[in-house]
Every structure is written in C-alpha cells, then in structure tokens.
Amino acid sequence: LGLTINMNQLRPNKLSDILGQKQVVEVLNINIKSAKSRSDCLAHTLFYGPPGTGKTTLANAIANEMGCSLQIANGANLRTIKNLLPYVMRVEDHSILFIDEIHRMTNIVEEFLYPVMADFKVDMSISGKEIFGETLSIDIPRFTLMGATTEYGSLSKPLIDRFQHKHTLKLYNKVELQEIVNINSKKLNLKMSDKASVFVTKVSRGTPRIANAALEWLRDYRIAQGSETLSE
C-alpha cells in the first residue's frame, strides 16, 4: 500500500515556500541576490538553533535558489582530515558544502578547514626523501561552506569568525506551525478535523520536523484503519 512517504516531499524547495523564520529568509534573499549579481558564491553561512527548525531545509532551498549543487555531511562523522577531504575535493564552482552538527568536528578537521574557508586552498603535508615536511597547496573552486549547530557555545571563535553570515533559527509559533500542518496534511492526502489539526500543532512543540513525522504516522494509521477523516 505504500504506507510511507519520502519526507523530502514535504520540504520546501524555495525560500518563498518556507513558513516562519521570516527575518532569516529576508536576509538570505538579499545575500543570494547580491551573490548572483556578482556571479559569486554565497559567503560562508552558519545556522544555529534548536533541532528540527529548518537548517537543512534552508540549505536545500538556498542551493535551489543559487542553482548549484549541494553536498551534505555530518560533523559527527568528520573525525579525521581523511573523512573531510572527499567532500572538499568534490566542491564545484559556487557549490555548497553543508555540515550538520558542525560542533562535533574534531579540532584537527576544524583547523584544516581554516585555509579552505579563507583562501579556497587545501594545504596538505607531503613526505619523501627530499621533500619531507613540505606542504602542498591546492587551489579549489570558490564555494560556500554552510554549518548548522544546536550548540553555538561549543564552536571555537576562530571557526565562528570565518562565517560571514550567521543566522539564529527559532522555534515556530502556533500560527506558523498550524499553517505547516494544514499544508502538509493536504500533500499527504490526509483529512483531519480542526481539532485533530490543532492537536498535532500542539504536540509538535514548535518544530516542523516533529509535525511532519506526526502527520506521516497519522497518514499511515488512516490507511491501515481504512478511515477517511481523522478526529482528535
């Protein structure tokens, strides 16, 4: 019966489709317009705020607005330079590398990123009988590093300073979240009573991710039960 859905189908593809985070979206639109007018990549950007408030969604939407490729990595998996290097070497001109949970990178990986972010260069130590200890510097395309964190206080000042744009994401208010619930329930072909819709909004605790997960479960439940409309 296909009881599950790709939750990416519920994710907005453009900034204009994003509900909530109004001030952040307004500033991002300005940044994007400026970058595109200069035929340049977006400046390095950091998002911080509670889990599930749209950091990855914003990265996807920005990539679509910029018309560029997007790579997604998780800081928890970037323990060594070897872990990070494939992502860095695959960046394209004006592309985006998004690192979620960037606060979980190790210090050695963070320090490796400094020249990458500042000069778009990869500095690698090389060894050999005649060149032991020398450093090879490789130019890479200009790209945007995006970081996302729920723990801003865990980031070092040198790393924070290398992000030209910093945006705080907040929990969604009831009106914004209610609208998200109403829109996404229609995408899932899920008919709910007003009371059921309000209940989903309430239990989602200001977080679209929780709301979408609840809607998916309710969609599956409705199909399994064979009911048309869900009430509270």
Give the ranges of each region predicted by the language model.
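Pre-Walker A (pre-P-loop) alpha-helix and adjacent loop at the N terminus of AAA/AAA+ ATPase modules
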Residues: 6-44, 85, 89
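Walker A/P-loop
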Residues: 33-75, 87-92
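Conserved AAA+ ATPase core "coupling" helix
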Residues: 154-187, 194-199, 213
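AAA+/SF3 P-loop NTPase mechanochemical coupling elements
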Residues: 128-148
